[in-house]
Amino acid sequence: MIFASSGSSSQESKSSGSSAKTTAAKTSEEKSNDDAKEEKTEFGLNETADLDGTQITVTNVKKSMGNEYIKPKNGNEYVVVTLNIENKSDKDISYNPLDFQIQNEDGQITQNTFGPSDDNDLSSGNLTPNGKVSGTITFESKKSKTYKVLYTPEFWNDKKITFNLQ
């Protein structure tokens, strides 16, 4: 009896050791999932992306064939994106429409361009802490059902935010 009891406690010890390892693994997995949530890089229309205190929200998207004075190339269209930028960091930040690109459904990526203006074109500048700016950026792209706006704040930085537009 004592011998059987000893064997039983040995198995319990092994079992509880395994359970402790499983709990530790789950805790590590949960932390991994939390990190993945914090590093979200894809957003939709009216969703705010936060990259080191720079908050960007794409609030509107319009497609245009231009006006009587300016038209896109044959097979292309203008995509006019309205966005808000807000500085939630404790230092000045810079912003520039050249930090934004558009990608069409074929994977072609293009820079902003001159197009039909609505007098609210986003220029470049700086924002102090809690500063805000909004404006439009015009892109010319091959006609596409879907677009993505890509934001890369600095060319030497590998951080990128994507806004999926429908």
Please report, for each region that a protein language model flagged, where it lies by residue.
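Conserved functional micro-motifs across diverse proteins
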Residues: 2-166
